[in-house]
Amino acid sequence: MKLHILAVGHKMPDWIATGFDEYTKRMPPELRIELREIKPEQRSSGRQADSVMAAERLKIEAALPKNARIVALDERGKDWTTMQLAGALPGWQQDGRDVAFLIGGADGLDPQLKARSDMLLRVSSLTLPHAMVRVLLAEQLYRAWTITQNHPYHRV
């Protein structure tokens, strides 16, 4: 099973890539994290946010792995703890389907994309830069895996 992170945005600062890579290289081969960057749509003065999100939705859908479980990151999603994420991971592995985590652009994710997702998940009640969410998600996936392995990385 692969964990895919589909994120709207490109040309991230080096420190984002460094942080993201730090956690992805720690993951075991059977839970590899793969990042797919989606080029954001141009915002112009006459273009509405719903038009931008719809165009980005098409790009995300084209990049989605077939039959993947879709977890859309959204401020109105379920507010899971790290332990809940760790509890879900073994079931996802047994299911055998890849998991695709979706990170929207500046305007968020298109409502149609959220509606077809298997789950809406909130990363934080705080407003975070989208680039930072990549690093936080990679760290939390690594932490969840270490919990399932009784690895000392996670301390209570």
UniProtKB/Swiss-Prot annotation:
Classification via Pfam families: SPOUT_MTase (PF02590)
HAMAP family, sorted: 23SrRNA_methyltr_H
Function comment: Specifically methylates the pseudouridine at position 1915 (m3Psi1915) in 23S rRNA.
Residues annotated as transmembrane: none
SUPFAM superfamilies: alpha/beta knot
Keyword hit for Transferase: yes
Species classification: Bacteria, Pseudomonadati, Pseudomonadota, Betaproteobacteria, Burkholderiales
EC number: 2.1.1.177
Gene3D superfamilies: 3.40.1280.10
Principal subcellular localization: cytoplasm
Entry protein name: Ribosomal RNA large subunit methyltransferase H
Keywords assigned by UniProt, alphabetized: Cytoplasm, Methyltransferase, rRNA processing, S-adenosyl-L-methionine, Transferase
Species annotation: Paraburkholderia phytofirmans (strain DSM 17436 / LMG 22146 / PsJN)
Catalytically driven reaction(s): pseudouridine(1915) in 23S rRNA + S-adenosyl-L-methionine = N(3)-methylpseudouridine(1915) in 23S rRNA + S-adenosyl-L-homocysteine + H(+)
Chain residues that bind S-adenosyl-L-methionine: L73, G104, V123, S124, S125, L126, T127, L128
Family matches, as CDD domains: RlmH-like
